[in-house]
Swiss-Prot record:
The gene is Padi1. The keyword Oxidoreductase does not apply. Induction: Induced by all-trans retinoic acid. It comes from Rattus norvegicus. The keyword Transmembrane does not apply. The active site is at residue 644. InterPro entries: Cupredoxin (IPR008972), PAD (IPR004303), PAD_C (IPR013530), PAD_central_sf (IPR036556), PAD_N (IPR013732), PAD_N_sf (IPR038685), Prot_Arg_deaminase_cen_dom (IPR013733). Its EC number is 3.5.3.15. It is an enzyme of class 3 (hydrolase). One of its GO terms (cellular component) is nucleus. This is Protein-arginine deiminase type-1. The lineage of its organism: Eukaryota, Metazoa, Chordata, Craniata, Vertebrata.
Amino acid sequence: MASQRAVQLSLRKPAHAVCVIGVGTLVDVYSDVPKGAKTFEVSGSSEVKIYMVYDPSRVAEPAGPAHWPLDANVDVVVVADTVSKNLHDLKVKVSYFKSQDTAALAHSLLYLTAVDVSLDVDTGRTGKVKKGSGDKKNWRWGSGGSGAILLVNCDRDVHGSREDLHDSHLRSLEDLQDMSPMVLSCDGPDDLFKSHKPVLKASLPDSRRLGVFCARGGTSLSNYKQVLGPRHNSYEVERHPGERDIQFYVEGLAFPDASFSGLLSLSVSLVDTRPLSEVLVFTDSVTFRVAPWIMTPNTQPPLELYVCSVTDMHGSNDKFLEDMSHLATKANCKLVVCPRLENRNDRWIQDEMEFGYIDAPHKSFPVVFDSPRNRGLRDFALKKILGPDFGYVTREIQFAGASGLDSFGNLDVSPPVRVGNTEYPLGRILIGGNFPKSSGRRMARVVRDFLHAQQVQAPVELYSDWLSVGHVDEFLSFVPTSDQKGFRLLLASPSACLQLFQEKKEEGYGEAKQFDGLKHKTKRSINDILADRHLRRDSAHVQKCIDWNREVLKQELGLSESDIVDIPQLFFLKGAYAEAFFPDMVNMVVLGKYLGIPKPFGPIINGRCCLEEKVRSLLEPLGLRCVFIDDFLFYHQLLGEIHCGTNVRRKPFAFRWWNSVP
């Protein structure tokens, strides 16, 4: 039972006070006491409950009709349980006595006006506000937790250039659906609210990260006014006569980040505004958490496949687009082609952006994270993807340009995993960087800070700086499976490739040639490859780099060797950095059970590519379908593959992030 300020009583005149129903008011029975008084008793209106608060070790509770001793260890708290119909219509009477058997020496009177003032939000996470439900001030994770949730209003419901969060005026009623409802109860005698005003307030830092709109009903946009936000952190609520509940809508303006935990608080105070008063009568507070941006792994069903139409010295990539169209059709997935006019001949759409989503009990929608690489596709996400119920977020690097590791081919996420006793029901984010405690390239801190601050997909930093491009998608991928594990981790493996070629040599196919079927590319026999000491040395170095990541992934994702599939792949060093010797097969696009895999142009044995056959034998028993696609001229020769040149929006998790415990 929360208590307000103490109300002092007087023997000379009645005291008057305002109380909030359900909230204790401390009554000071000691400030003005008649001479000779030793005991007291308290009575009141039937709508007022009276509580004696005391320490049993110091004060004995009186028996029967006996009075309470005038002892400073005894407090009187009164609680009204009904809203007043008129001013001062509830009474509390304190009588003072010299002894138990004598008449009262004097009486003090307290007249109360009881009001209902509370701020309520969806603490139960049902999508609806329930009055008086649970602890509103504290936000708790987990399936048994509580606390309201805000979405960052980062979509654009009306055509314009920026996200809705930049608007201080409501531009469409649909925008209210992106906001969290909040109800202010202010029931009581109208005359009281002429002098006592509800004041809504946020701290200055919080006011820069949220917006609050007051709703006065109707379908006109003018009925909705922003009352709190970056320009104002306090609002004296305009209560109309007879009004019991006032509706508000709250929007998030910023995602969690290095300097922002994601928690935001709002309070309402009932303030006595009469001259020479300005007394704070009561305060109620609520706490929101801003919904994090969540990535979706390859195990989630695909919804849309994005790919760019480009032209270069080899002509147009129409054949590749046709292959992507066939793959999308098989996977029952929509194909979205970004035309040259919009991509400015930038084909690396995976590097430009990452699809994710935000989720609250009342609303969810996809959000695209625009990378800071800012090349030909730099305007595509903002101008062509941002729209109604499709949000946008980005992080820009200050005072420096983006490195190759800031592209989002260097950003992935695992399926849900369990590591020891720790559950990661939304998986873990994977990013690439330099070898620990060494100099080298890393993803920009501003991006890493953003990813860590989302909390629900705790990032793991891998070692990718050994690659020329430096992206994690060059040596790993995840594929869905129908068994109990639900997925496999695919790792590129030079050792597996050399072992396969050695087996084929021993079977008598040493003269079968890599790159058979490719024009303008020197063919190399299996014998030649196996005899190439430089290639073997490079392969040994690359294998060590991948093996280091393998151990990190096993530890951080709770994987065993049976959860990993080694995909044969050779690399060579160009200077100090590695590049794929033939199209990098782990750099695939995953559309459900259909895998769009870079065609490796491996040695042809008995009419079939031995590399393709090996990969089929590894993956198709898992229920997957391998579709090998030629990306050699338009992607591989430019140090990228199919995954680099495509992007997939996937179905969000059924699991609700607030039920996790980071």
